[in-house]
C-alpha cells in the first residue's frame, strides 16, 4: 500500500490504522476494549444480554472503517477526507451528549474527544495542503479540479 502524499492523507491514515487496531482488539479481546472505553466488565452476563454481540459488530465495523480510511489515504481521495470532517464532528457531538446525559461513563468522553481532534487535524491538513498547493502553483493553475497531491492513479477510480 502506498504512503499518503499529503498532510490530510496522513491524518486519515493514522485514524484508519488506529480504527483497524481497535477493531481487531475488540474482536480478539473484547474485555480489554470494554475496559479501554470505560465500561464495566462483568464476570457473567444475564440471559438476553447482547453486549458481546454488539461489541463484536462494533469491532468489525471499526476494523472495516480502518481499512476504508487506509484505502482513502493510499489513493489520496480528498473528497473522502472532506466528508469525514463533518461526520467526525457529528460523532463527537453524539458521543458527548450520551456522556452528558449519563448514558455512557465519563471516560467515554475520550472517544468523543478523539473524534473531534481527528476532525480538526484533518481539516487543518486539508487547509495546509491547499495553502501549500496555492503557494507552489501559478494562480491560473490552481482550481477546484486540481488535486494538490497530483494526478490520480488508475486504481483510484472512485474520484
Give residue ranges: language-model regions.
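Short, intrinsically disordered terminal tails adjacent to the first/last structured region
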Residues: 136-159
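Short, Lys/Arg-rich, polar N-terminal cytosolic tail immediately upstream
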Residues: 1-5
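Membrane-water interface at the C-terminal end of transmembrane alpha helices
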Residues: 116-140
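Short helix-capping/hinge motifs at transmembrane helix termini and TM-loop junctions
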Residues: 29-30, 38-39, 76, 99-103, ...
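Residue-level micro-sites within transmembrane alpha helices that shape
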Residues: 87, 112-116
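Membrane-helix boundary connector in multi-pass membrane proteins
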Residues: 74, 80-83, 93-112
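Core segments of alpha-helical transmembrane spans in multipass integral membrane proteins
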Residues: 17-27, 47-73, 85-93
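Membrane-helix boundary elements
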Residues: 6-52
Amino acid at each position: 500500500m502506498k504512503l499518503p502524499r499529503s498532510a490530510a492523507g496522513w491524518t486519515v491514515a493514522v485514524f484508519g490504522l488506529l480504527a483497524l487496531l481497535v477493531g481487531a482488539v475488540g474482536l480478539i479481546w473484547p474485555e480489554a476494549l470494554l475496559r479501554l472505553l470505560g465500561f464495566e466488565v462483568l464476570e457473567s452476563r444475564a440471559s438476553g444480554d447482547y453486549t458481546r454481540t454488539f461489541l463484536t459488530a462494533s469491532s468489525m465495523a471499526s476494523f472495516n472503517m480502518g481499512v476504508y480510511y487506509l484505502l482513502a489515504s493510499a489513493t489520496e481521495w480528498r473528497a473522502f477526507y472532506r466528508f469525514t470532517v463533518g461526520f467526525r464532528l457529528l460523532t463527537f457531538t453524539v458521543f458527548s451528549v450520551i456522556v452528558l446525559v449519563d448514558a455512557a461513563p465519563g471516560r467515554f468522553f475520550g472517544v468523543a474527544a478523539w473524534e473531534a481532534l481527528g476532525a480538526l487535524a484533518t481539516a487543518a491538513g486539508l487547509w495546509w495542503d491547499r495553502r501549500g498547493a496555492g503557494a507552489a502553483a501559478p494562480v491560473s493553475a490552481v482550481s477546484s479540479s486540481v488535486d494538490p497531491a497530483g494526478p490520480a492513479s488508475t486504481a483510484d477510480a472512485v474520484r
